[in-house]
Amino acid sequence: FGLVGSLAVSGVSSNRPGVRVNTLLEFLGIADENLQTQVSILGLIAASVLVFKSFASLYLSKRTLFFLSRRSAIISRILLNKLLDQEMLRVRGRTIQETIFALTAGVQAVTLSILGASLLLIADIFLIVAFSISLFLVDTLVAILSLTLFSTIGILMYSLMHRKAQRLGELATKLEISSSDKISEVVSCYRELSVKNRRNFYAQEIGEMRHSIAEAGANLGVMSLLSKYIMEITMVVGGLAIGAAQFIAQPATRAVAVISIFLISSARIAPAILRIQTGLITIRTNIGTAKPTLDLIEEYLKEGIADLDPVEGYKGREYFKHTGFSSHVTASNVSFTYPNRKKEVISNLELNIKEGEFVGIVGPSGSGKTTLVDLLLGVIHPEFGAIKISGSNPAEIIQKWPGAIAYVPQETSIINGSIKENICLGYLASEVPDEVIIELLRDVQLEEFLTLPGGIHSSTGERGSKLSGGQKQRIGLARALFTNPKLLVLDEATSALDATTEKKITSFLTSIKGTLTIIVIAHRLSTVKDADKVIYMKGGRVLGEGSFEELRG
């Protein structure tokens, strides 16, 4: 289109077209036509090319956006698979909000923003090259002047802005994550902040962060506008300078032709160079924005990324027979130290728990009980020694017999959903018969849920806001029993219960002992008085074991 416009201007400005213009007119077969016919044909060609370009651009843009969006989803899934394949300590090495950002907004910044801008850059570079070639055919001097002038301005603006753009992107990302963390904190600690009348402290802190984010966004917007206006000023000043020089050195008709060609070429070259410069700034900005994601990708690429096992649906409780699994647990000379700490949390620990035993593990805070639980669950691995369940390490057992080991934490996490969905955690609730859930609720003394208007489909509220602490823990126990485990680990799971409910749960555990191995971590000795064996830990070691009466004595 730029070439056709340039040829039209050359034809208007001179009775005798230049050699290159005339050659092209001959190629089109209109060299002998009058000027009006030539301009009409050239205009029709230009309009046709422009319409075709618009439809082609729309089609390619649609394909590109869908391609990048799908790549974004695939990258998020791959990174999430790798994240969930890590040890718990590495997963918790980042804040929840930082992880969420890295897997969502950060991935979009990498694909839709960085890769998308890169593809647009390539298209604009090809556009400039094609237009420059056609412009060289019409007027070499104008082509050189236009490319040199606008390229110099574009390079200069990029060199002055790109570092600041990346810093602003990093700052905005950091503040975005921090503000999300603060919002989560104020919601989680609402009662404590209310009684202190300090909710306004968080409101002010979050408000200041959002203000800084807004300022960073405004600065980036100003940089984009600045580039646009500088390029427009360059077009005007460049046109005036070239015009003045041409009127001094050339006849008026030639000067008008050169100015016209420059303005037409500027109308195509300047916006393309501006888009390239803006695209490069966008890339640098989003490199800052995507830093958490890029760090995650770099970290995982060093280790290799393996996909997780395919997801299987619910196949009925008979599927959870765990044939061949033995719940015999041993620990041989096990030691463990947390990263960046010198003192061992578990030190030369020896353990032997027979299949079907009900074992209580007690000890003061900091004795290593919860760390031992994490080692048994395979979410962390011993630094020295070995833990074996059914003759293999816990991670292998979980892969071979999923659900054979179950866990009830000290504080059960409740998802935003129904009672049934919480018990079916990790499975589609719609695939599980209601009778299975009703039986589990009766086992854990939660029959009151059955009388609710919605029954087991009643909502638990935001993070279990409609439940008491004891109800949450019993849902956690029902969740653990859902997969018919052969080894059940409870980490102070009854500490939030009242004495009556704790007694009922303890009685239930006593009634099922022998059918599975039960390991109960407790502070209160009363919780483990019916255990077959009680283990006393202190300083990461087993200092004694025996019956409840023996240890109490």
Predicted feature residues:
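Cytosolic ends of transmembrane helices, especially the final helix of ABC transmembrane type-1 domains
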Residues: R191-S194, R198, V222, R268-L301, ...
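Juxtamembrane loop-to-helix connectors within ABC transporter transmembrane domains
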Residues: L84-V129, S188, S212, A216, ...
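Transmembrane helix-loop-helix hairpins at lipid-water interfaces of multipass membrane proteins
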Residues: F1-F52, F136-T148, A252-V256
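Transmembrane helices of ABC transporter permease
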Residues: L120-L171, A241-V258
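ABC-family ATPase nucleotide-binding domain "signature/switch" substructure
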Residues: A406, E411, N422, L440, ...
